[in-house]
Amino acid sequence: MDKKTIYFICTGNSCRSQMAEGWGKKILGDEWQVYSGGIEAHGVNPKAIEAMKEVGIDISNHTSNLIDQNILHQSDLVVTLCSDADKNCPILPPSVKKEHWGFDDPAGKPWSEFQRVRDEIKTAIESFKTR
């Protein structure tokens, strides 16, 4: 069976989409190819790397990437993680399903916000898996 493709998108591909890619690979990796991208590329936030390391997921080798049109158009599901990405998501072909899962941006906030958003993303992906 071929794996489906899920593409997580946020503004800068720095925090939320990076954590979603890490969780997605861990939770959905048997059934889904998991990618992330951004409307812009801001670099992976070191606190996002640390937050995921705290739960045993290494995203230190991730890179911050602009949305890849090839991945976007070949995805089965595109998930926007912030309102900016939701509003500015490129037009998708009819074959690509899009969902919006909004999460607060932890960038520039206290450590506890990174942990909270990380855990909320995990819960959303676990919930998605059981649909």
Swiss-Prot record:
Its main location: cytoplasm. The active site is at C10, C82, C89. Transmembrane segments: none annotated. Keywords: Arsenical resistance, Cytoplasm, Disulfide bond, Oxidoreductase, Redox-active center. It catalyses: arsenate + [thioredoxin]-dithiol + H(+) = arsenite + [thioredoxin]-disulfide + H2O. The keyword Mitochondrion does not apply. GO terms for cellular component: cytoplasm. Disulfide bonds join C10-C82, C82-C89. It is found in: Cytoplasm. SUPFAM superfamilies: Phosphotyrosine protein phosphatases I. GO terms for molecular function: arsenate reductase (thioredoxin) activity; protein tyrosine phosphatase activity. Its EC number is 1.20.4.4. It is an enzyme of class 1 (oxidoreductase). InterPro entries: Arsenate_reductase_ArsC, Ptyr_pPase, Ptyr_pPase_sf. HAMAP family: Arsenate_reduct (MF_01624). PANTHER family: ARSENATE REDUCTASE. Belongs to the low molecular weight phosphotyrosine protein phosphatase family. Thioredoxin-coupled ArsC subfamily. Catalyzes the reduction of arsenate [As(V)] to arsenite [As(III)]. This is Arsenate reductase 2.
